[in-house]
Amino acid sequence: MLFRSFTLIAMGVGFGYYAYFEEGNLFLNKIFYLLNQNTYSVMENDVLVAIPLFLFMGYVVERANIVNRLFFSLQLATRHLPGSMAVAALATCAIFATASGIIGAVVTLMGLLAFPAMVKANYHRGFASGVICAGGTLGILIPPSIMLIVYAAIAELSPLRLYAAAIFPGFMLAGFYMIYVVGYAFFKPSIAPKPIEEEIPPTKVIILQLVTSFLPLALLILSVLGSILLGLATPAE
């Protein structure tokens, strides 16, 4: 995606150079002035200050080992569903996306956390890889998406409106992923075997693990996204 982005930028500069071409002024083309002016106007946007802050928030969540405990507690809570580990991975991706906002962090963390666990449980490798990649892309839509902040700065739109418009489609897409995974694992159980009942702890322990792992993330999500969507604070604040 990064390579394609630079390719599109180069194409735009090339066509602009051709449109403003004047003989004898090879290095005084207007496109260079416009490129510099537009780049500076985008980079001085205050909204972009939120990007490193959201990245830091995701880093803190990852280092706190909350995502690890959340994944395994969700796996146990959904153990009666076909493909329970895949469902837990998708749910964890959607929740962690609200605390990181970047695709790479979600894919990398879940690839190191959920993929080995699914392979160890005899899940099909291609199926497990697809689940991780699909869940990682949820970070594009679900606020606080870094891509939405960049798009808002470039298109001169309100990040608040973009967040409000993207949050429902993001979680709806996550729900569709889970429905597909459950249906696929139901009709083809060999790709996602059910967990062994002997390894499952008591229900009280599962509920306690789920609450203690989800509650800190829920408070963080409500405080950050709630204040933004209610208009109490800007993304940078």
What are these regions, as identified by a protein language model?
Residues M1-E237:
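Alpha-helical transmembrane segments of multi-pass membrane transport proteins
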